[in-house]
Swiss-Prot record:
Keywords of the record: Lectin
Family membership noted in the UniProt record: Belongs to the jacalin lectin family.
Protein name per UniProt: Jacalin-related lectin 2
Record-annotated Jacalin-type lectin domain positions: 4-163
Molecular function as annotated in GO: carbohydrate binding
Cross-referenced InterPro entries: Jacalin-like_lectin_dom, Jacalin-like_lectin_dom_sf
One Pfam family matching this protein: Jacalin
Amino acid sequence: MEGKIKIGPVGTDYSGKKTMVDWDEGSHNGIISQIFLSHGPTGVFSIQFQFMLDDTFFLSSCHGQNTGSMFDVILLNCPHEYITGISGEYLKSDGASGPQIRSLAFATNLNQYGPFGGSSSQSSIWNHEQQFRFKLGKFRQFSGFYGTYNASGLQNIGVYLQPTIVKPTGTRNAEETESNIVLG
């Protein structure tokens, strides 16, 4: 993806296994209107997105299976609400069965959603769980998700960031500011 920064993925890397399915939703413009999650006490089983492009809505493929005991829909106030971060927990053990992405939470410029999936009240030390947090800034820089899944659930997840050019709002240039700081 030209001009985009690929962040992650977090989770387990089973790249040599034939049962893994790679997915990539980074070619969209990053304007997500809905996120669909199947999850349960052991983690996230599937994730799916609805994107908006030129006032038309497109549904992505379902990445995983909707076999969790819980299903949630995150409805964003599109196009005014946009993703500014993603966080959660993943299992850092290549031999474990089940979803390796244990929980997911999403931050937008307007709200916080989640966590969805396994309870963080379980001991992370004994379960080999690791926390992650991708903060994408306060501007609309999110550009998509990617990851892998298998029959057990979501195995890893990452995000794309499209850097935004931000111009300084002050009238002074950097040299003037620096000289005022140094000289008082």
